[in-house]
Amino acid sequence: MNFELISEYQPTGDQPEAIAQLTEGVLEGVPAQTLLGVTGSGKTFTIANVIKNINKPTLILSHNKTLAAQLYGEFKSFFPNNAVEYYVSYYDYYQPEAYLPSSDTYIEKDLAINEEIDKLRLAATSALLSGRKDVVVVSSVSCIYGMGNPSDFYNNVIEIKKGKLLDRNVFLRRLVDSLYVRNDIELNRGNFRVKGDTVDIYLAYSDNLLRVMFWDDEIDAIEEIDPISGIRLATFDEYKIYPANLFMTTKESQLRAIHQIEDDLTKEVAKFEEEGKMYEAKRLYERVTYDMEMIRELGHCSGIENYSRYFDGRNAGTRPYCLLDFFPDDFLIVIDESH
């Protein structure tokens, strides 16, 4: 799908020339260009026209959440029929874990996640991995912060099709593998419920429910439902259900990671013991062993991001995956400089 720019205005003044020059520069492979203009001169509208002409997935970087939200609103109005997404930090509050050796005090990590922003982040990654070109993601420095492996995220996408033979219980297990949680009493975002042959999924990246109805071992209908009124909004012949969390892994990766972590734990504990640091060795062993038990039983643990390179299969010292890895090789970056 191509970008469809909708506006009551037409480029005027210096805008047509700027649009033409920027478009030509991108098409000719110019690595960097600068658009100058005073406040209120229509730079955002000019860039929107360039995006329409180039027709590639675009990352727009702003220096804080507030201005990113403003740009998101503006581009959303210019491209209402395209995928305009918002990706910033989803923490309302964050206190990292800490240890004070002098008093043997351990301070646990404490945080509060904004569920609405979490939904928008998942919508952004889902749009990028959908294969469509008409995607604009407005982001902040969060786009270079660590996140899950895009391959693992994509491998956990569930594709369903009306008339397809699929055992309902197999479908439910796949939802759990994609980190959706069954809750037949209170349906919240990222949950699903089962009533007979009907499965309602509150998609983690949407405001609506997806209803999948089975007839024996066959998918009979796929519908989008308003979660409050229960009104059917749309029907589909096929649908892709994206995971409920950005940090995905496979069972194979999980088992491999646990073995590697335990091997490294043995080496580090032995190293501490050789140095006479028996307390540190004991503390490290207890913490990591407990984390591995939690991962085996629940699939996650507090501070699991500390083990990310093992789950991603990365070598020591290599950077983690970030939002940039979810973009295709050929995409456009626009940086909005601060005043």
Roles of regions detected by a PLM:
Residues 1-339:
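ASCE RecA-like P-loop NTPase motor cores
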